[in-house]
């Protein structure tokens, strides 16, 4: 009996070792992703295999699927200098070489165990029998440097790769078929602002991260995400701030029009929420102009309920911002006459009876009350205020329904975002193959209890 027990134990140990070795082999191509990556997305290979639209958007087309092992995950990543990358497991390097010879702009060359190519003078490609790497877009002059970077990545050991980073461990723990973990600095600035809410003053976007699971159904991409930090002190402050956000009632869920780029929804007590806004540098930059004309901080203190910020433009000079908020006891209305008298030269505040307009040169901003709703927006007359609450072309109901009951949500108008050049050159560029034909993106913030 003892001998049999020893034999079973030996078999068990052998099986464990075999599983560990198999696990290492499964991840060996992932070590090509650099440890310095600021964002990493994992896409289940089955998702790619089932969609001919994902790989067809790559610079060398969907034929590359014949040479890849789509039983393994495909990874997209952003390098520290802002380039986008892709990493995939190679199944047939000979077939991959044939495909690259037809797709490459110049001749595929060999460097040791690696093959190097460029596509359209802007994408660097490197591969061996194990991994395929793509990096770009870069200028034609920068292609040699990009290819040298690919060789270093293909050569690097696990300690120099993303596998050694907590970012990868976090990514690996997300159960969605499409998942990502990113430093907030990898996001466009305006989209990054909500994820920085609650971060301590002095913390920058490289110290705060986002973990997200992605699902697409009926043309809507839903992203369930959480902001956090690998630095305990920063993470603690982020977690503390989450209690300020209350379940959204849905008062303004139908107020976003299809002409707007994105909108942020929450439910707050303004007195508690104001310190978070004041510590968020990106949002403060947007709101600073208002504070020079009116006492926006005092307006915010009157907020108690649902609040929504929507943006139709992205430049600092023209954010095209609209704000709607449920208010209680807005005592600041008694100060409007003082604001009128205190305007700087060249500026003015006009209006009465709950509707006022601030003007400075060619720019204008209207604000006021519609019942117990505060509104503030660029260039709206009193007769047009109703269109803010009931736009003629609101976002689809199946999109707006996802907002209600959450504690913070963002809705992104995909066509408008792509049209404004926001779906390339940053982490949002990673989503481009997946958001193809998606009508809207709903990003819901989840918080630890």
In which residue ranges do the predicted regions lie?
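Single conserved position on a long alpha-helix in the C-terminal lobe of the eukaryotic protein kinase
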Residues: 41, 66-166, 305-399
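C-terminal motif of bacterial Sec signal peptides marking the signal peptidase cleavage site
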Residues: 20-23
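Long, K/E/R/D-enriched contiguous segments that form extended
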Residues: 260-341
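Hydrophobic lipid-interacting interfaces of membrane-associated proteins
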Residues: 137-142, 173-189, 228-230, 269-271, ...
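Bacterial lipoprotein signal-peptidase II cleavage site
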Residues: 25-31
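Leucine-rich, highly hydrophobic segment in Treponema pallidum outer-membrane-associated proteins
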Residues: 158-263, 403-449
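Bacterial N-terminal signal peptides that target proteins for export
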Residues: 2-12
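Post-signal peptide N-terminal segment of mature Sec-exported envelope proteins
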Residues: 31-53, 71, 76-77
């Amino acid at each position: 009996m003892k001998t049999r027990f020893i034999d079973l134990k030996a078999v068990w140990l052998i099986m464990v070792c075999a599983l560990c070795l198999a696990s290492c082999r499964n991840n060996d191509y992932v070590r090509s992703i650099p440890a310095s990556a600021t964002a990493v997305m994992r896409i289940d290979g089955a998702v790619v295999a089932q969609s001919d639209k994902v790989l067809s958007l790559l610079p060398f087309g969907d034929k590359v699927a014949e040479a890849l092992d789509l039983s393994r995950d495909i990874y997209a990543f952003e390098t520290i200098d802002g380039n986008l990358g892709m990493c995939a497991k190679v199944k047939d390097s000979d077939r991959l070489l044939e495909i690259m010879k037809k797709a490459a702009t110049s001749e595929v060359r060999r460097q040791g165990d690696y093959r190097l190519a460029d596509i359209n003078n802007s994408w660097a490609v490197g591969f061996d029998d194990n991994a395929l790497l793509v990096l770009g877009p870069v200028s034609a002059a920068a292609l040699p440097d990009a290819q040298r970077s690919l060789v270093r990545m293909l050569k690097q050991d696990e300690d120099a790769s993303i596998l050694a980073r907590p970012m990868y461990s976090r990514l690996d723990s997300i159960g969605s078929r499409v998942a990502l973990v990113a430093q907030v600095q990898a996001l466009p600035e305006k989209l990054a602002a909500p994820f920085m809410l609650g971060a301590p003053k002095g913390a920058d976007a490289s110290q705060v991260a986002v973990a997200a699971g992605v699902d697409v159904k009926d043309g809507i991409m839903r992203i369930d995400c959480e902001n956090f930090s690998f630095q305990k002190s920063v993470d603690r402050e982020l977690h503390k701030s989450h209690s300020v956000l209350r379940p959204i009632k849905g008062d303004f869920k139908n107020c976003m029009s299809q002409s707007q780029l994105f909108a942020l929804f929450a439910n707050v007590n303004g007195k508690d929420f104001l310190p978070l806004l004041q510590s968020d540098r990106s949002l403060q930059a947007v709101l600073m102009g208002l504070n020079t004309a009116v006492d926006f901080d005092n307006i915010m203190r009157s907020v108690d309920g649902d609040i929504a910020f929507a943006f139709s433009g992205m430049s600092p000079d023209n954010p095209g911002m609209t704000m709607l908020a449920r208010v209680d006891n807005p005592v600041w209305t008694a100060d409007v006459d003082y604001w009128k008298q205190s305007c700087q030269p060249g500026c003015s505040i006009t209006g009465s009876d709950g509707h006022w307009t601030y003007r400075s040169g060619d720019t204008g901003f209207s604000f006021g009350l519609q019942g117990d709703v505060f509104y503030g927006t660029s260039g709206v007359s009193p007769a047009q205020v109703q269109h803010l609450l009931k736009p003629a072309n609101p976002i689809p109901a199946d999109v707006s329904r996802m907002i209600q009951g959450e504690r913070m949500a963002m809705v992104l108008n995909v066509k408008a975002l792509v049209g404004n050049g926001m779906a390339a050159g940053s982490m949002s560029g990673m989503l481009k193959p997946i958001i193809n034909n998606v009508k809207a993106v709903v990003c819901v913030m989840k918080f630890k209890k």
